[in-house]
């Protein structure tokens, strides 16, 4: 279960700790969404863990709880066209940078001194061009509460977007598959071709039928 041990080390050095994670690197359709979360030292978020280990109902409840507790949080969204333009890795970094900027701006708007920011980034790739201290944490959404909170913010935001997109493109089953490559989704691509939400670089030429 995620906890605050990593954060406490940084808090002792006077840092503002920002957990960073993403959702949606692998789907065939939809955006990649990143989130950044700044928790206070007394944060109490029982049951918050890696978003993939939680039920949808628990994630939704945690989403509201995290927003209520956090000192600052931010969301970054990069759409399919941009993913195709710069590749998924760079798009993920772009979304993360947006999210960190949003979280820091929210925290800065609160009374009190703003401490030097330190990032805890899920995975093994540091955020490029970040000028301050950062640490990558493999499996961080199960180790750091700040990263786990960010993972929930990112996933719930993205899932809600895909459910909304389903109303516009119901043939692809986005509400169910969230843009991932389920059999239903691949069958729909074979039948209808891609829609504007699809990542052209993620699907083979066989499925691409331009309108």
From Swiss-Prot:
<dbReference type="GO" id="GO:0004523">
    <property type="term" value="F:RNA-DNA hybrid ribonuclease activity"/>
</dbReference>
<dbReference type="InterPro" id="IPR036397">
    <property type="entry name" value="RNaseH_sf"/>
</dbReference>
<protein>
    <recommendedName>
        <fullName>Ribonuclease HII 2</fullName>
        <ecNumber>3.1.26.4</ecNumber>
    </recommendedName>
</protein>
<dbReference type="GO" id="GO:0003723">
    <property type="term" value="F:RNA binding"/>
</dbReference>
<dbReference type="InterPro" id="IPR022898">
    <property type="entry name" value="RNase_HII"/>
</dbReference>
<dbReference type="GO" id="GO:0006298">
    <property type="term" value="P:mismatch repair"/>
</dbReference>
<feature type="binding site">
    <location>
        <position position="22"/>
    </location>
    <ligand>
        <name>a divalent metal cation</name>
    </ligand>
</feature>
<keyword id="KW-0963">Cytoplasm</keyword>
<keyword id="KW-0464">Manganese</keyword>
<dbReference type="Pfam" id="PF01351">
    <property type="entry name" value="RNase_HII"/>
</dbReference>
<dbReference type="GO" id="GO:0030145">
    <property type="term" value="F:manganese ion binding"/>
</dbReference>
<feature type="binding site">
    <location>
        <position position="21"/>
    </location>
    <ligand>
        <name>a divalent metal cation</name>
    </ligand>
</feature>
<feature type="domain" description="RNase H type-2">
    <location>
        <begin position="15"/>
        <end position="211"/>
    </location>
</feature>
<comment type="function">
    <text>Endonuclease that specifically degrades the RNA of RNA-DNA hybrids.</text>
</comment>
<dbReference type="InterPro" id="IPR012337">
    <property type="entry name" value="RNaseH-like_sf"/>
</dbReference>
<dbReference type="GO" id="GO:0032299">
    <property type="term" value="C:ribonuclease H2 complex"/>
</dbReference>
<keyword id="KW-0540">Nuclease</keyword>
<keyword id="KW-0479">Metal-binding</keyword>
<feature type="binding site">
    <location>
        <position position="122"/>
    </location>
    <ligand>
        <name>a divalent metal cation</name>
    </ligand>
</feature>
<keyword id="KW-0255">Endonuclease</keyword>
<dbReference type="GO" id="GO:0005737">
    <property type="term" value="C:cytoplasm"/>
</dbReference>
<dbReference type="InterPro" id="IPR001352">
    <property type="entry name" value="RNase_HII/HIII"/>
</dbReference>
<keyword id="KW-0378">Hydrolase</keyword>
<dbReference type="GO" id="GO:0043137">
    <property type="term" value="P:DNA replication, removal of RNA primer"/>
</dbReference>
<dbReference type="InterPro" id="IPR024567">
    <property type="entry name" value="RNase_HII/HIII_dom"/>
</dbReference>
<comment type="similarity">
    <text>Belongs to the RNase HII family.</text>
</comment>
